[in-house]
């Protein structure tokens, strides 16, 4: 039984260790922050980057509109969700979670 638990632990860390999610926004657009991002599941980490304070991040990830949510798999961009012209995120929590789940399923 102990072996099964250890094996499951190793397997789950491998699967979950690949996905990170970052929200890119700017302080002047804080009214349109995406609060539900911290409730996403099966991610190694969830982050926030204020591109008004860290313009290098905006350049590095080619952020054209805020907020933008990027899902990274193994350190590489896998999926991007961007706000509409009114600077509001159009993607839902369910859509972002489904993208995460699909990336995890693609490993099997």
Regions found by a protein language model. Give the residues of each.
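Short, glycine/charged-enriched secondary-structure capping and boundary segments
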Residues: 35-38, 63, 84-85
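N-terminal post-signal-peptidase region of extra-cytosolic proteins
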Residues: 51-57
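Non-catalytic, surface beta->alpha helical segment in thiol-disulfide oxidoreductase systems
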Residues: 71-108
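Sec-dependent signal peptide recognition
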Residues: 1-7
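Local sequence-structure signature of Cys/Sec-based thiol-disulfide redox active-site neighborhoods
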Residues: 15-47
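Structural micro-motif
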Residues: 61-72
């Amino acid at each position: 039984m102990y072996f099964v638990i250890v094996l499951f632990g190793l397997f789950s860390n491998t699967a979950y260790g690949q996905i990170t999610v970052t929200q890119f926004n700017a302080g002047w657009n804080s009214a349109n922050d995406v609060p539900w991002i911290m409730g996403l599941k099966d991610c190694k980490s969830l982050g926030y980057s204020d591109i008004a304070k860290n313009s290098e991040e905006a350049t590095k990830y080619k952020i054209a509109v805020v907020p933008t949510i990027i899902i990274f798999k193994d350190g590489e961009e896998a999926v991007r969700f961007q706000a509409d012209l009114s600077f509001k995120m159009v993607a839902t929590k369910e859509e972002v979670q489904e993208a995460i789940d699909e990336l995890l399923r693609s490993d099997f």
